[in-house]
From Swiss-Prot:
Pfam families: Profilin. Binds to actin and affects the structure of the cytoskeleton. At high concentrations, profilin prevents the polymerization of actin, whereas it enhances it at low concentrations. By binding to PIP2, it inhibits the formation of IP3 and DG. SMART domains: PROF (SM00392). PANTHER family: PROFILIN, PROFILIN-3. InterPro entries: PFN (IPR048278), PFN_euk (IPR005455), PFN_sf (IPR036140), Profilin_CS (IPR027310). It comes from the Eukaryota. GO terms for molecular function: actin monomer binding. Belongs to the profilin family. Keywords: Actin-binding, Allergen, Cytoplasm, Cytoskeleton. It is found in: Cytoplasm, Cytoskeleton. GO terms for cellular component: cell cortex; cytoskeleton. This is Profilin-3. Occurs in many kinds of cells as a complex with monomeric actin in a 1:1 ratio.
Amino acid sequence: MSWQTYVDEHLMCDIDGHHLTAAAIIGHDGSVWAQSSSFPQFKPEEVAAIMKDFDEPGSLAPTGLHLGGTKYMVIQGEPGAVIRGKKGSGGITVKKTGQALIIGIYDEPLTPGQCNMIVERLGDYLLEQGM
């Protein structure tokens, strides 16, 4: 299965008639493995800051999580494994696997819990596969 298929079928999947706003699978080095057409153009330093927070949990809290020029307030995640951010009625979930970052961006009517479930389910599967 291609990485694009994981994005299209597993991350951008339909939940009660709704889906994530955008999603991507990105290497730890910031290289894009696959992304939805709506995924924002991001800067390498934004991915570097996210990676730093996985190594040093809490490092993003003072500045917020930035992706594609959008600033998200960092909320409770799982240190070293999952970072969650909120902005208005939407937000972001980032799950770290051995080689990649699984990123989901959502807005209402999708809920934070639905975004977490979608992103973390794929992330857990990839971890089980040694990815």
